[in-house]
């Protein structure tokens, strides 16, 4: 428990290994690879609590998270720490210290207003911006279309769950020699978003990767039509890399399970009020 509280209050990070050789690429647009236990067993424990929250009416979610949904300023904090003075989201001709893509639903918790759902059997979709592997789209590689000689490539990942995000990180670990994942204090600890910071590009591998992508998309520039789910590797990445990734993501999901459990207990407390011991613990933890 002390470790969970420490991660929430101080943040957590991991440095991923560099691989000189790209994995065999096979880009296919339109569908994400399905989740499996191999890519994070903790998720399947954590998703049970997410489903509990997913069944709650959104007006109640807004009420109980109003004071703990602080503005997500983690990207700004990263810019400050790395002394990044200028960023760009697109445009090869634009000069900047970093090229950035934010795939997260910044400062949002749910997708649309909704009433309560009776039971998990009636859940047909994930209405929360939490643990939704379908949120990872091919936009995660968009910065590479506009990368020239920027010092950093920075991605705000919408989720840490599923094969897609691990395959993506494995590719980035051949495109850049320094790849770090961060879950900052100033990110939302209600959601499983995180930041990837990559630097020291491996030009040879980047050229190989972009050649494959451009041959599949039949375009040398980014097209918005490519902003869809995708799969990119036929074969699973090596177990060593998966475990290194899970070393980081498990810390995040353990913290989220604790936070979500407090929130659910608060929303279902006998007091029938936002003034209850679970909510007080939650506020103390996150504020």
Swiss-Prot record:
<dbReference type="InterPro" id="IPR005009">
    <property type="entry name" value="Poxvirus_mRNA-cap_ssu"/>
</dbReference>
<keyword id="KW-0804">Transcription</keyword>
<comment type="function">
    <text>Regulatory subunit of the mRNA cap enzyme which stabilizes the catalytic subunit and enhances its methyltransferase activity through an allosteric mechanism. Heterodimeric mRNA capping enzyme catalyzes the linkage of a N7-methyl-guanosine moiety to the first transcribed nucleotide (cap 0 structure), whereas the polymerase associated VP39 is responsible for a second methylation at the 2'-O position of the ribose (cap 1 structure).</text>
</comment>
<comment type="subunit">
    <text>Heterodimer of a catalytic and a regulatory subunit. Intrinsic methyltransferase activity of the catalytic subunit is weak and needs to be stimulated 30- to 50-fold by the regulatory subunit, which is itself catalytically inert.</text>
</comment>
<protein>
    <recommendedName>
        <fullName>mRNA-capping enzyme regulatory subunit</fullName>
    </recommendedName>
</protein>
<keyword id="KW-0946">Virion</keyword>
<keyword id="KW-0805">Transcription regulation</keyword>
<keyword id="KW-0806">Transcription termination</keyword>
<dbReference type="GO" id="GO:0044423">
    <property type="term" value="C:virion component"/>
</dbReference>
<dbReference type="GO" id="GO:0004482">
    <property type="term" value="F:mRNA 5'-cap (guanine-N7-)-methyltransferase activity"/>
</dbReference>
<dbReference type="Pfam" id="PF03341">
    <property type="entry name" value="Pox_mRNA-cap"/>
</dbReference>
<keyword id="KW-0506">mRNA capping</keyword>
<dbReference type="InterPro" id="IPR043096">
    <property type="entry name" value="Poxvirus_mRNA-cap_ssu_sf"/>
</dbReference>
<keyword id="KW-0507">mRNA processing</keyword>
<comment type="function">
    <text>The heterodimeric enzyme is also involved in early viral gene transcription termination and intermediate viral gene transcription initiation. Early gene transcription termination requires the termination factor VTF, the DNA-dependent ATPase NPH-I and the Rap94 subunit of the viral RNA polymerase, as well as the presence of a specific termination motif. Binds, together with RAP94, to the termination motif 5'-UUUUUNU-3' in the nascent early mRNA.</text>
</comment>
<dbReference type="GO" id="GO:0006353">
    <property type="term" value="P:DNA-templated transcription termination"/>
</dbReference>
<comment type="similarity">
    <text>Belongs to the chordopoxvirinae mRNA-capping enzyme regulatory subunit family.</text>
</comment>
